[in-house]
């Protein structure tokens, strides 16, 4: 409780005070470019992944653009060991995905190189 008073939780983007379980405020969350792939038959991610191997569908939570809030969020997770971010990303993914009848056979992540694992000391995707 004293820790929360001395070090209140702030939005990663605008620095506004936010709930201790959040990573960004609602205003900044509205500014994130979430993808709208939702396992649609035609999407740009599916086209890119299909160049590497055959897939029926593909999904990404956010559009990762240089200098974007999505980039800031991912970098905080990867390099600053902010576990709360992984939990928030998992919650956002659940909110955004509606599997309906098409549950995925596989959820794949980008593998972490052993050298990076040694440098960071953890794999950020294990938090997610």
Which residues are covered by each model-predicted region?
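Glycine-rich phosphate/pyrophosphate-handling loop used in enzymes and phosphotransfer proteins
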Residues: 1-128
């Amino acid at each position: 409780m004293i820790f929360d008073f001395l070090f209140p939780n702030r939005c990663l983007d605008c620095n506004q005070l936010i709930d201790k379980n959040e990573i960004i405020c609602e205003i900044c969350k509205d500014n994130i470019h979430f993808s709208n792939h939702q396992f649609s038959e035609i999407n740009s991610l599916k086209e890119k992944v299909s160049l590497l191997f055959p897939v029926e569908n593909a999904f990404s939570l956010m559009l990762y653009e240089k200098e974007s809030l999505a980039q800031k969020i991912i970098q905080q997770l990867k390099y600053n060991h902010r576990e709360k971010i992984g939990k928030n990303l998992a919650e956002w993914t659940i909110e955004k995905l509606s599997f309906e009848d098409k549950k995925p056979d596989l959820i794949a992540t980008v593998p972490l190189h052993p050298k990076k694992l040694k440098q960071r000391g953890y794999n950020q995707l294990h938090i997610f």
